[in-house]
Amino acid sequence: MKKLLTRLALLMILCAALALPVFADAVTDSISVCIGYFGWSEDEYVEKTKFSWQELDDWYGGALDTHEEYYSYCNGSGRTYLAFARGFYIRDLLDYAGVDVNSIASIDFFTKDHSVGAYRSFTKYALLDQPRYYFPNLAGDAETGELYAWDGGDDLWVGAYQVEPMLALEDYTEWDTAGFDFESYADESLFSTGSRFHLFFGQASPEEAATSSAAKYVYKILVTFSGTPALSSEESNLDLVVGSDHALHVTADAEDDALTAYV
């Protein structure tokens, strides 16, 4: 009987361990930027560059300016999600990686806690061109599922301002609060690196529900360029006998030198 109880206890501990979410070991120390074209499989994308977080964090001598920003979200059921984060703008990362932002069609984010495919995909317009905002006056009632203005008025846009999409090196997040209240106590002392790299991008409107898209543990970005590589040859008119051998030299012109070499 004692052996049976011991085995049951061990089994319960094992099950509990398997049920734990991914946390500390999912934190990413480096991030890759990979490039390719629409229709390519994930393994066909070319790794343009890979950076450790120290190479990017200006607090540790890194190359990118980091910023402290607030971000607001709602989940579509009356719950709000607030973030205070320090990190670098995605636009700056792509520029530093040598990616032509104007040629991008879409951007995919891969995370360590999501094993199959991209965790979240955006068109270039949705992530980088569409204005996105922080709404400090946004509050919600989880019981009714309704959103309301924290200041008691009827304008959810009070105090709103535009924000840039970011990959956070450290952050503090909280559910079921409003930005005006959150800002009164959220500070650097609450920062944690436990979700690095953490994607934040704000809201296009107060009602936009996108809490699940604030991806944690990002380790790879797939950049898809619009169009296709252009292939050309100096030989335009070939007069050959059927079955004869002839080497045709083709030149590839892609959106990036790394892709030109690959194609």
Which residues fall in each region the model found?
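Bacterial N-terminal signal peptides that target proteins for export
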Residues: 1-9
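Bacterial N-terminal signal peptides
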Residues: 9-19
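Short acidic, gly/pro-rich beta-turn/loop elements at beta-sheet edges
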Residues: 18, 119, 258-260
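Extracytoplasmic soluble-region selector
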Residues: 26, 100-103, 227-263
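N-terminal intrinsically disordered, low-complexity segments enriched in P/E/S/T
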Residues: 24-228
